[in-house]
Regions:
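Alpha-helical transmembrane segments of multi-pass membrane proteins
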Residues: 1-454
């Protein structure tokens, strides 16, 4: 029966597609196939002429032809929206009427709608950036409707998961519990990320100097490419806020372990990106601010420096949200220690970058290496103090490691380029810090000893 259905459809498709007068009706022909199978299905059901296998096979053919008819007859966002509507309605019927087959059919259709949405977004890479207005385009509307559709499906899934039947473990339920939230989270993240990118692409296109009476300008200088650097920083900041917010939402409302761990892992990867690629981009803007931007025709202002605080604020928020979520989701003490060390590394990274930035702006580029050595030494002292106060041995060990790295950097890299007076000042400062650390260890040795025994 199934083979006959596809053979009939294949011959019909070939006839319609080869005739220029009929090819516009391909979608209707496909929908007609769905109607025929629905009539057969109704007849089988009313007369009870076959077993459940034939019934569900015919039902599957009905939805298959409906699903195929949509992209054949329509294009663009309409395909995505109709697949979302079809999948959502099927899932709703399956859940509310307790018809599991509808629920199972809906999942691949929802997956197709997501792939169609990705295709819609990819098409916009070939459109003139001036034709796309951020947060005011068909892609954004489609994304919002997709979020609402997937959100409704996730809501239904969570609402009905409390019944005893659905609490039983099965591969389908296990896949569904991850698959549906993943669709929702990815769609929400990518929808707003794309709009931020569209905004900066529009700004870049508007910066064009084409048609302006400027002599001796090459193709590269036609655009203000510093805008791309701003875009990268804003996208990293958005990612940090999004996944930090997801971790916080999970902590306060959902308390889902899989979602929590996913938010933590992706958040940590984004933090790594912020403190490597993000810092590199901040360095590009700092250089542009000091040296006049990508070329002389574009304005350079203090926003080139201030944008760094958007990134660092996002880093701080993500760290705070991940830390709160981790205390609830992950009971492993070693991971808590790891996360605390990530926080201290981030703080030290921020302070070091601030020091380099402002010394560079002030014109003290020659001594920022020395400034970093002093900063790291002071921070190691703070870590020792905090480790003693909080009775955390790993903080004290980390402080000593940091101090050792600072000494190695000083003697192998910094001190050779310093004058005699500068060398004397640095060695005195480091000596004082060593004395303070030794004093703290001696003063609180009983407290440290009690901690070791414990």
């Amino acid at each position: 029966i199934l083979l006959n259905s596809f053979i009939y459809f294949g011959f019909g498709y070939g006839i319609f597609n080869s005739n220029t007068k009929l090819d516009t009706y391909l979608g209707l022909f496909t929908l007609f196939n769905a109607v025929i199978h629905f009539v057969v299905l109704f007849f089988i059901k009313s007369k009870k002429l076959a077993d459940s296998t034939l019934f569900y096979s015919t039902l599957g053919m009905v939805f298959t032809f409906i699903t195929i008819a949509i992209p054949i007859q329509l294009d663009g966002s309409w395909v995505t929206l109709l697949w979302i509507a079809q999948g959502t309605i099927l899932f709703w019927i399956g859940k509310t009427k307790n018809i599991p087959i509808y629920e199972k059919i809906s999942l691949p259709i929802l997956g197709l709608s997501f792939l169609s949405l990705l295709e819609d977004w990819s098409f916009y890479h070939y459109v003139n950036n001036l034709d796309i207005h951020a947060f005011w385009n068909i892609n954004f509307l489609t994304g919002i409707l997709a979020i609402l559709g997937y959100g409704f499906v996730v809501y239904l899934s969570r609402k009905h998961a409390e019944t005893e039947e659905n609490q039983k473990f099965s591969p389908f339920n296990a896949i569904k519990s991850f698959y549906l939230p993943a669709l929702l989270v990815l769609t929400a993240y990518l929808t707003f990320r794309n709009e931020i990118a569209y905004y900066f692409n529009y700004w870049l296109e508007n910066s064009s100097l084409k048609g302006k009476e400027i002599s001796e300008i090459d193709d590269y200088s036609l655009y203000n490419y510093d805008i791309n650097v701003f875009k990268n920083i804003y996208l990293i900041a958005y990612s940090l806020v999004f996944f930090g917010g997801l971790a916080l939402l999970n902590f306060h409302k959902f308390k889902n372990k899989v979602l929590g761990i996913s938010a933590i892992v992706i958040g940590l990867l984004t933090l790594l990106s912020a403190q490597t690629f993000g810092l590199e981009e901040l360095g590009e803007l700092r250089y542009a601010y000091i040296n006049g931007g990508s070329n002389e025709y574009f304005d350079v202002n203090f926003n080139y420096i201030l944008v760094r605080y958007l990134l660092w604020g996002s880093v701080a928020f993500a760290l705070w949200a991940i830390f709160k979520n981790t205390k609830f989701i992950i009971e492993n003490t070693k991971f808590h220690i790891f996360l605390e060390m990530v926080i201290h590394i981030s703080i030290l990274n921020f302070l070091s970058n601030e020091l380099v930035t402002w010394m560079d702006i002030a014109g003290y580029q020659d001594i920022f290496k020395l400034g970093l050595s002093i900063l790291w030494s002071v921070y190691s002292l703070l870590l020792v103090s905090l480790g003693i106060y909080k009775k955390k041995k790993y903080l004290r060990i980390s402080a000593l490691v940091l101090f050792g790295v600072t000494l190695a950097k000083l003697f192998l890299y910094d001190i050779s380029n310093l004058s005699t007076i500068s060398k004397t000042v640095v060695l005195i400062v480091l000596g004082l810090l060593l004395l303070i650390i030794s004093f703290l260890y001696n003063k609180f040795k009983d407290k440290i000893g009690d901690e070791t025994k414990h």
